[in-house]
Amino acid sequence: MVRRDRLRRMREWWVQVGLLAVPLLAAYLHIPPPQLSPALHSWKTSGKFFTYKGLRIFYQDSVGVVGSPEIVVLLHGFPTSSYDWYKIWEGLTLRFHRVIALDFLGFGFSDKPRPHQYSIFEQASIVESLLRHLGLQNRRINLLSHDYGDIVAQELLYRYKQNRSGRLTIKSLCLSNGGIFPETHRPLLLQKLLKDGGVLSPILTRLMNFFVFSRGLTPVFGPYTRPTESELWDMWAGIRNNDGNLVIDSLLQYINQRKKFRRRWVGALASVTIPIHFIYGPLDPINPYPEFLELYRKTLPRSTVSILDDHISHYPQLEDPMGFLNAYMGFINSF
């Protein structure tokens, strides 16, 4: 009898917990995205949108040096956006006539359709479509990329090498801290869980919040160059815009694509004759030193490399904008 009463009370207790948990969970899952900071709001309002196959793609296009024919297109990393380039933007306008950046599909202020099979091939096609939209499809383009953007740049380079219809005419390529080699890439634990999580992935993406995001991203910055809380909120606001946290698992399929198409993408880097450079933050836990750099130099002996200070990590353009900009300008002025 006593045991039966105890079981009944336990059942009642769990029912009460459930009744409390359901509305709390519902409220949590419907937390609105954070408001944009004045700086991020300014970035959005100064940009524009174009349409790719019915989807809105955000981009920035600044006119810089008058009379210069030079154009640079910036390709951002995962999981952030074109806002990653804001610290070097003005410096680039002092050297280039056009400075252009976009938010890839599923990132930043661009549309984030779901369900959707996100792919590096589609992102490369979006870059080509943007340049056609701007009337620059026949101009020689300098590509500057980071992380995820490095893989998109590799596909653009492959199309250029194959002389594909609609391809960009690439003048130069500068990569930075991207996992261009699957064998030296060390994804974060959360990335591993999300890309292979199956039925678990949709649950994890819905439970992701600022605390989880910031604790996951901060370690990929150097110890002296970590973002402030307000900077992390800007990154998180870009992700939460258009419910972007719900497509992170789909976007992460690029890791599997990179393994599948390694020969195509690494081969494109190794076989072209345009100037190629790599800017490297050596403390990067995702592309660790010296394994990554040794393989890079072995695979691409013609490429030049700039190694930043020892404490610079995975986001060199944010951690050391002046060092990054100087390294890039040194490369651009070398040919």
Curated annotation (Swiss-Prot):
Highest rank taxon of the organism: Eukaryota
Extent of motif RVIALD: 98-103
Protein's cellular compartments: Endoplasmic reticulum membrane
Membrane topology: Multi-pass membrane protein
AB hydrolase-1 domain span: 71-310
BP-aspect Gene Ontology terms: regulation of lipid storage; response to retinoic acid
Keywords from the UniProt entry: Endoplasmic reticulum, Glycoprotein, Hydrolase, Membrane, Transmembrane, Transmembrane helix
This enzyme's EC code(s): 3.-.-.-
Class of enzymatic activity (EC top level): hydrolase
Molecular-function annotations in GO: hydrolase activity
Sequence intervals crossing the membrane: 13-33, 63-83, 266-286
GO CC aspect terms: endoplasmic reticulum; endoplasmic reticulum membrane
Glycosylation sites: 163
Broad class of where this protein is predominantly found: endoplasmic reticulum
Keyword Ubl conjugation on entry: no
Annotated family: Belongs to the AB hydrolase superfamily.
Name of this chain's protein: Mesoderm-specific transcript homolog protein
Organism per entry: Rattus norvegicus (Rat)
Phylogenetic classification of the source organism: Eukaryota, Metazoa, Chordata, Craniata, Vertebrata
Gene behind the chain: Mest
